[in-house]
C-alpha cells in the first residue's frame, strides 16, 4: 500500500534556469486523464460562472485542467469525499483529489501566431538583436508589422538577406516580379512579424556562426572586436545550454496555477481578482479572434493587425509597460504583470523567498551602550525571555523548579526572579548575532555576548558602528540566536565583534573611534587657553597619585581642565624643547632636583630617579588612568 502524501527525496547537483522549448511548456501544462482525454489547453477567457460561482470549463480557473476547487469533490458534485480519491468523473472530467493541486498544476495557451518574448527583444542587451546582428530598431520594425524583412533574396539583384522593406517598396518589387517581361524565376521571399523573426532565428547555424566569429575576432580590433566578442559570448551560451534561438519566439504560453492568481469574493458580493487574470483574458480573447479570422480567410491587413494586438497582449502579460502603452485597470492603475510580481524589493524573490521571517529572531531600535565591552551588546529582558524560551524552559524543568512545559510558560509570563536568574544562566556564554540591513559585506552581521538590560532597545558598542554603518538616529537591528553547539562555536570563534578588527575589503582597521568618541577624547585632553599653572608644592594642586586627582575631581575640588602636579613614576614622553632644565638644585641630603617645563624630577647621589611629578590637566589624568586600567584588564 502506497501513501500518495509521502515525500520523495530527489538528490540533484544544481538548478539551471534556461529557455523552455514549446514542447517543454506544453509538457508543464498537459496531462492525460485515465479515460485517455488530454487536458491542459486554456481556450476560453471566462473565469467563474456568475450564477453558480463555479469555474467555467476550459477557462482560466477550469477544474478539469487545474484540479478541483474543493477537496475531494468534482465539478458536478457526483463524487464527494476522500474515498473517491483518484477517480476522474465521467460527467465533468474532473479528477477527485485535494484542492491544493491548484497551486502547482499549470495550463497553456496555444497561440494562433508566434509572438516574440519581450524580455529577449527589449531587454538590455537585446539578445535577439545581438544574435541576428541587426539594430534593435530594425528588429522591432519587423516584430510590430512596420517593415518586411527579406528571408530569401532569390534571383532579385537589388535585394539582400535580412534587408528591410517598407510596404510601398515591397509592392513595387512585387509588381516587378509579376510583370510579364520579368526574368526572375526564383522569387524572393519576405516575411513580417514574429513569424519572420522565428524564421531568421531558425536559419542560424550556431556552431558555424561561432567558428566564423572566432576567425573574425582574430583579425579585428577596437569596438568591432568588442561587438564580435559580445555576439560570440551569447552564441556560446546558447550552444552550452542546448537552447535554440527560435525558442525566444513563443508558440505556446504557460498559464500559471489559478491559486497563484486567485479570485476572491468580497463582502458586497463583488469579486477581487489578480491582475494576471485580466492580462491572460486579453491574450485569450485576441488569440481566439485571430484564429477565427484565419479560419474565414479574412483580409491580410485585418489578420496582421490582430497579430500585432496579440503580440502587444503577450508583451503586457510578461512585462507590462516595457514597450508601448501600459495596460491599466480600474482607477488608471497599471496592471501587475509576471515581471512586476517577480522583480524588485516587493517581488517574489526579495520579499517572499529571501526576506522570510525566521524563528528565534527579533528586531528593535539600537541605542548606544558606552559601558559595554566591545564583544558585548545589551539585550532587552523582554526580548531575551522570548528568544531563549526553550532553553529557559529546559533548565527550569531540569532544576525541578517546575514539572512541565505548561507550568514553565506560566512562570515565564509572570517574569519571576527565579526565571530571570535562570535566563541569566542560559545567556551566559551563549552568543547572539546582530544584523543591520542592508548587509553589504560580511561585517554586516556579527556575534556578541548578550547582557540583559531594561527597556526595549538593543544597546550597541559605539566602536562596532562603522562595520554595520549604523548610527543612533532610529536605526533598527535584527537579533538571531544560533541554536546548535556548532553554530554557537562558529559565532564565537569567527563572528565575535572583537575578532573582526580589520576590514576584509581593505585590510585596514574598521574599528576606529569617530564622532562622539573623538569629540569626547578631544574635550577630555584639551588645554584651556589662559588657565593658570600652579607652582609645585601648592597643596590644592599637588597630588601623590592619579587616583587622588580623580577623587578630587569627583569631589568637585578641581575642574576637568585645571592644571595639576601629580606624582607619576612611569615613562613620560616629553616634548620639552629646552636642552637644560629651567632650574637645577642640589639639596643638603645630596639629592638633586631638576625642574623642567612640565615635570619635576628628583635624583639620588648616584643619579637614579627617586620621584617624578608631572604637570598635566585633570582630563588627561582621567584619560591615562582609563587606558592603563583597560590595558591591564585585557
UniProtKB/Swiss-Prot annotation:
Binds 1 Mg(2+) ion per subunit. Gene3D superfamilies: 1.10.40.90, 2.40.40.20, RNA polymerase II, clamp domain, RNA polymerase Rpb1, domain 3. InterPro entries: DNA-dir_RpoC1_gamma (IPR012755), DNA-dir_RpoC_beta_prime (IPR045867), RNA_pol_asu (IPR000722), RNA_pol_N (IPR006592), RNA_pol_Rpb1_1 (IPR007080), RNA_pol_Rpb1_3 (IPR007066), RNA_pol_Rpb1_3_sf (IPR042102), RNA_pol_Rpb1_clamp_domain (IPR044893). One of its GO terms (molecular function) is DNA-directed RNA polymerase activity. It holds the Pfam family RNA_pol_Rpb1_2. GO terms for biological process: DNA-templated transcription. It catalyses: RNA(n) + a ribonucleoside 5'-triphosphate = RNA(n+1) + diphosphate. Zn(2+) binds at residues 74, 76, 89, 92. Its cofactor is Mg(2+); Zn(2+). Mg(2+) binds at residues 471, 473, 475. The keyword Coiled coil does not apply. Its EC number is 2.7.7.6. Keywords: DNA-directed RNA polymerase, Magnesium, Metal-binding, Nucleotidyltransferase, Transcription, Transferase, Zinc. One of its GO terms (cellular component) is DNA-directed RNA polymerase complex. In cyanobacteria the RNAP catalytic core is composed of 2 alpha, 1 beta, 1 beta', 1 gamma and 1 omega subunit. When a sigma factor is associated with the core the holoenzyme is formed, which can initiate transcription. Belongs to the RNA polymerase beta' chain family. RpoC1 subfamily. This is DNA-directed RNA polymerase subunit gamma. The lineage of its organism: Bacteria, Bacillati, Cyanobacteriota, Cyanophyceae, Synechococcales.
Amino acid at each position: 500500500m502506497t501513501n500518495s502524501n509521502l515525500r520523495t527525496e530527489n538528490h540533484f547537483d544544481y538548478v539551471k534556469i534556461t529557455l523552455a522549448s514549446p514542447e517543454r511548456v506544453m509538457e508543464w501544462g498537459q496531462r492525460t486523464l485515465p479515460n485517455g482525454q488530454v487536458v491542459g489547453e486554456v481556450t476560453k477567457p471566462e473565469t467563474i460562472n456568475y450564477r453558480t460561482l463555479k469555474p467555467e470549463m476550459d477557462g482560466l480557473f477550469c477544474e478539469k485542467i487545474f484540479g478541483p476547487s474543493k477537496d475531494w469533490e468534482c465539478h458536478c458534485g457526483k463524487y464527494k469525499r476522500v474515498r473517491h480519491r483518484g477517480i476522474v468523473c465521467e460527467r465533468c472530467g474532473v479528477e477527485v483529489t485535494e484542492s491544493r493541486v491548484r497551486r502547482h498544476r499549470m495550463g497553456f495557451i496555444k497561440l494562433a501566431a508566434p509572438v516574440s518574448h519581450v524580455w529577449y527583444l527589449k531587454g538590455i542587451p537585446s539578445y535577439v538583436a545581438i544574435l541576428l546582428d541587426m539594430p534593435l530598431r530594425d528588429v522591432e520594425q519587423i516584430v510590430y508589422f512596420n517593415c518586411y524583412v527579406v528571408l530569401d533574396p532569390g534571383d532579385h539583384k537589388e535585394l539582400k538577406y535580412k534587408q528591410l522593406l517598407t510596404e510601398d517598396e515591397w509592392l513595387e518589387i512585387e509588381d516587378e516580379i509579376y510583370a510579364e517581361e520579368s526574368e526572375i524565376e526564383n522569387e524572393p521571399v519576405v516575411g513580417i512579424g514574429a513569424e519572420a523573426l522565428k524564421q531568421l532565428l531558425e536559419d542560424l547555424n550556431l556552431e558555424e556562426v561561432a567558428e566564423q566569429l572566432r576567425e573574425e575576432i582574430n583579425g579585428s580590433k577596437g569596438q568591432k572586436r568588442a561587438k564580435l566578442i559580445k555576439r560570440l559570448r551569447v552564441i556560446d551560451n546558447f550552444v552550452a545550454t542546448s537552447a535554440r534561438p527560435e525558442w525566444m519566439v513563443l508558440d505556446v504560453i504557460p498559464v500559471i496555477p489559478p491559486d497563484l492568481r486567485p479570485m476572491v469574493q468580497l463582502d458586497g458580493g463583488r469579486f477581487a481578482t489578480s491582475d494576471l487574470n485580466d492580462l491572460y483574458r486579453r491574450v485569450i480573447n485576441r488569440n481566439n479572434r485571430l484564429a477565427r479570422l484565419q479560419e474565414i480567410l479574412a483580409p491580410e491587413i485585418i489578420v496582421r493587425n490582430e497579430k500585432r494586438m496579440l503580440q502587444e497582449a503577450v508583451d503586457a502579460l510578461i512585462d507590462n509597460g516595457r514597450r508601448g502603452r501600459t495596460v491599466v485597470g480600474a482607477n488608471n492603475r497599471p496592471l501587475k504583470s509576471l515581471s512586476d510580481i517577480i522583480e524588485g524589493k516587493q517581488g517574489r524573490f526579495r520579499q517572499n523567498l529571501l526576506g522570510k521571517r525566521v524563528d528565534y529572531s527579533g528586531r528593535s531600535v539600537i541605542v548606544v551602550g558606552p559601558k559595554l565591552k566591545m564583544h558585548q551588546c545589551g539585550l532587552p529582558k523582554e526580548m531575551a525571555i522570548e528568544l531563549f524560551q526553550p532553553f529557559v524552559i529546559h533548565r527550569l524543568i531540569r532544576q525541578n523548579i517546575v514539572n512541565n512545559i505548561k507550568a514553565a510558560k506560566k512562570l515565564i509570563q509572570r517574569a519571576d526572579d527565579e526565571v530571570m536568574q535562570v535566563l541569566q544562566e542560559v545567556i551566559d556564554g551563549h552568543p547572539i548575532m546582530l544584523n543591520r540591513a542592508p548587509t553589504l559585506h560580511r561585517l554586516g552581521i556579527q556575534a556578541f555576548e548578550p547582557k540583559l538590560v531594561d527597556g526595549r532597545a538593543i544597546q550597541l558598542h559605539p566602536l562596532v558602528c562603522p562595520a554595520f554603518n549604523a548610527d543612533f538616529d532610529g536605526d533598527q537591528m535584527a537579533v538571531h540566536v544560533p541554536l546548535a553547539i556548532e553554530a554557537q562555536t562558529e559565532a564565537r570563534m569567527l563572528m565575535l565583534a572583537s575578532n573582526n578588527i580589520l576590514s576584509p575589503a581593505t585590510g585596514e582597521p574598521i574599528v576606529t573611534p569617530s564622532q562622539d568618541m573623538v569629540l569626547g577624547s578631544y574635550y577630555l585632553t584639551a588645554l584651556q587657553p589662559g588657565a593658570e599653572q600652579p607652582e609645585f608644592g601648592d597643596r590644592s594642586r599637588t597630588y601623590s597619585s592619579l587616583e587622588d586627582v580623580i577623587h578630587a575631581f569627583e569631589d568637585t575640588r578641581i575642574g576637568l581642565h585645571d592644571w595639576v602636579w601629580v606624582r607619576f613614576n612611569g615613562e613620560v614622553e616629553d616634548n620639552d624643547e629646552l636642552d637644560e632644565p629651567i632650574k637645577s638644585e642640589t639639596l643638603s641630603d645630596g639629592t638633586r632636583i631638576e625642574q623642567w617645563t612640565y615635570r619635576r624630577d628628583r635624583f639620588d647621589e648616584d643619579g637614579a630617579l627617586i620621584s617624578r611629578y608631572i604637570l598635566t590637566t585633570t582630563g588627561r589624568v582621567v584619560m591615562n588612568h582609563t587606558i592603563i586600567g583597560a590595558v591591564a584588564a585585557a
